[in-house]
Amino acid sequence: MTSSQSFLRQRKPQANDETESELHNTPEPTKQDVVWGKTPGGEVFRVPTTHDVITTLFNPRYKKSHLDLLNLTLLGFQLVLFFILPRRASQIFFLFYFAFWRGAYDAGLGWVLTKQSKKKWIVREVQRLGWLDEKRRPAVRNWIRKQLADKMGKDYSFDDLPLEYNTWLLFRQAVDVILVNDFLSYCMFAFSCFRVPEGLSVLALLILRRWLGGFLLIAFNLWVKTEAHNVVKDYGWYWGDVFFQRGNLVFDGVFELAPHPMYSVGYAGYYGLSLIAGSYAVLFVSLAAHAAQFAFLVFFENPPVAASYKKISRHVSQPSNASSNGDIEMDPNTRSLISSPRKSATSQHDLLNKYFRRDVVVLRNLDLLRSTDAMLVLIIAYALMISFLPTLSARTMLALHFLHALAWCMIHYVGLGLILQAQSKTKFLVRHFMKNYHYSQNDGGGGAIVEAFTNWKAIYNLSMCMTYVSCVGVVWKSYSLPHDWTVGNELLRHTLGALLVGLHVWASMESFEVLGVFGWFFGDFFMEEFPTHLEYTGIYRYLNNPEAMGGAAWFGLALISGSKLVLSLAVIRHLANWWFLSSVENPHMRKLYGDSLRKDAGFVKVIKNHAPELKRVAREVKGTFDKVFEETADAVEDFLAKCERSSGPRISEVVQETKVLLQQSRERLVITRVSNDISAYDSSKYHVSISPSSLTGERTFHLGEPITIKWQAPHKHSRKDWIGLYRVGANKSNTVTKTSSMGMWLPVHGEEWDGDVPLGLKRVPSKHLESENGVVTFKGNTLPWLVGHYEVRYHHDGKYNVMSMDGPLEIFVDKPSDMTFSSVRNSLMRIVPLCLDSDPSLIPFSCKDRDPDDFSFWSEHQAKRICAAIKQVFNVDYAPEVVVADANLTALANRILISKEILSTRSDT
């Protein structure tokens, strides 16, 4: 598991630089004794001393809160039931009772902690309910204050501490109830399943060993938990980092023993108790509970920790052996590797992108256009098929081999043909590798071409070999050795078949002799460095397309085997090859070589020159190849024309309608909800207006520029009102919105919403105000990241009733007048900061020892924005990983220039 996922309760507080800088005026002796915390809002406070749950719950010297009394009552309830219930009933009850508390822990706490981490949900709920507000809920506040004050020490002051800390103290009391009851209910279930084995005297030594091992595991479990608590303290034990900040994370103590010791070796006691109980039921319940705890780790705890302590990309222009003030103290072995001397000052970011480029891990990052990935999938598929293929009859096996050969035939000629056709028209393969993989700036743009062609060669050769091998498989399954070669046409069939196979081999060898590896692998579809002229030598002196003779072996094998399946396979292969030549290779040759292509093959010219009296015969000879193709094409065209006359208009209409629906489907995936009380509101009193851009002074905004909207509404307007941005023309109605905003919306009272859920806070009514106004600013993910014209709509009560509209506003992007390095870089200097939310920490131009063109990312969305902007400005596609790998304006500008040069080469040919 990666380091970003290994923070669970591995938290040892360490002084934060920012916190220390704010506390420089603190007297020196106090700094060593006092622990300081910091809220998300920046408020610094002294963290009081807390006590562990065992001490506060069972030590009579400590006062008990009402929640402590509830906890003790539940514990006593379990003990009483254990002694009064029959053994079988006790087992069933405590099984479900433990499942309840385990679910409350893993699912309940997981859900609550996730919402608190993302949206500060617990704190906001306390605010919404007014539990700690002296004016709104004084009785509840005083009760909570007493509960917390009784549990804390003398250094605790309820009124002096921030809301986040007091909310955390209240939260941890609820957590104590869950944790303690979860533990005891498991123990009660295990004890109810305990039995003394029969034949104790015979198996005494074995049982004693089992019990001894169980007690050792329990003791080890207790030691791990105790040591872990000593390291992380209550702050880490009760997930304090989702409420406030108390320091950075380091690894220490028991956390060097095993990964996630609290959730791995920290559950050894489960298996110790299973050994002592000697029950498979306890063992399987332990395994299920342990698995649920790991699910809690993976799905609930790791994501917020990773989001809090790790950025997606940090492009640091430092030598890899330089010391780093990171947020995490590394493992000693890792640290020794990092600190080893290097000859060059290459950053770790650059090294990672140099040696690792979307590598396949199991099946993650799979790319079937990479030859190694395609071969991996084939090996896995064939291995699975061999392993799970049942015993089949000879007839079924023959049909399976035929389908196998047919599939490879279609993959080779049609599948690869379509890829090659796309490469000829749009440089599809080169674009794919250029978009998804990072290449060094020093390769002059050739890296993508070389890799695309290298992978194409491997895939093409693999496909061609599998085409022949699969065909031979069908022949082998259908062939039977003749009993008498002199009877019938057996000898003739084998002779003609062998001759056709020999003709195929000769034609292929002659073709390769003329074409070489460049022509054999269709190099002119990829590379422009080679000369663009044709030489008709060898077999090409006589035939324009000797590849047409390549199917001779298939017909020869059909003769030899005498199988209709092989014959049909040969015909299908012949038609597929004809389609490939006429639709893929010949159009590309005409585009590339133009008039230098000859019309007649060599042997046709000879017949035309030396036998004019046999002109009609010559046409028939020429038709041996070309005419067959033409007649087949005419037949297919006639068939399609007949189909088109009967159903063509309807099919075209359906296709066109489908395209339109698909284009609008994302926007229209919304169930329009309208308000029933709309008649009680006067829409004329609502007003929304677009503030002009600070850059242009008009309603035109650069892509990524924040858009400010002013609104005015009656004082009694709903607190759930919201404003959305929509493409002009997306909604036909001006009274009801029927398309999705695609995330481009904001509530008019953002402080009263938890993400997309209104908190339902009540406002204090005012008799003097008739209207209320405010401002919302669209930025980041709420902005449209596609150029075009948009309109603003003010909606009522969380529904889709439109109260006011304004627009249009235009989203534009400046395109450089010429494709030079300076113009491209200047465009990026404007685009990139806007895509990074204009966060100065992500573009540290003045940071020490840093390339001034470097930039960083907080989220993958920012990298996607840059990709979208580059596509709209320069018409070049990049995957987010490529932009993250560069993370530098100069590098990105060079990449764009090289890409444009590669993609524009011969575009007008």
Swiss-Prot record:
One GO term describing the cellular component: endoplasmic reticulum membrane
Pathways per UniProt: Phospholipid metabolism; phosphatidylcholine biosynthesis
PANTHER family, per database record: PHOSPHATIDYLETHANOLAMINE N-METHYLTRANSFERASE
Protein's cellular compartments: Endoplasmic reticulum membrane
Enzyme Commission code(s) on record: 2.1.1.17
GO molecular function: phosphatidylethanolamine N-methyltransferase activity
Residues annotated as transmembrane: 66-86, 92-112, 174-194, 200-220, 257-277, 280-300, 374-394, 400-420, 456-476, 498-518, 552-572
Annotated segments matching region Disordered: 1-33
Reaction(s) catalysed by this chain's protein: a 1,2-diacyl-sn-glycero-3-phosphoethanolamine + S-adenosyl-L-methionine = a 1,2-diacyl-sn-glycero-3-phospho-N-methylethanolamine + S-adenosyl-L-homocysteine + H(+)
Membrane topology type: Multi-pass membrane protein
Predominant location category: endoplasmic reticulum
Family indicated by similarity: Belongs to the class VI-like SAM-binding methyltransferase superfamily. CHO2 family.
Pfam families referenced in this protein's UniProt entry, alphabetically: PEMT (PF04191)
Gene Ontology biological process: methylation; phosphatidylcholine biosynthetic process
Keyword list, A-Z: Endoplasmic reticulum, Lipid biosynthesis, Lipid metabolism, Membrane, Methyltransferase, Phospholipid biosynthesis, Phospholipid metabolism, S-adenosyl-L-methionine, Transferase, Transmembrane, Transmembrane helix
Organism: Laccaria bicolor (strain S238N-H82 / ATCC MYA-4686) (Bicoloured deceiver)
Residue intervals annotated with topology Cytoplasmic: 87-91, 195-199, 278-279, 395-399, 477-497, 573-909
Top EC class for this record: transferase
Record-given protein name: Phosphatidylethanolamine N-methyltransferase
InterPro entries documented for this protein: Phopholipid_MeTrfase, Phosphatid-EA_MeTrfase_fun
Function, as annotated: Catalyzes the first step of the methylation pathway of phosphatidylcholine biosynthesis, the SAM-dependent methylation of phosphatidylethanolamine (PE) to phosphatidylmonomethylethanolamine (PMME).
Lumenal side: 1-65, 113-173, 221-256, 301-373, 421-455, 519-551
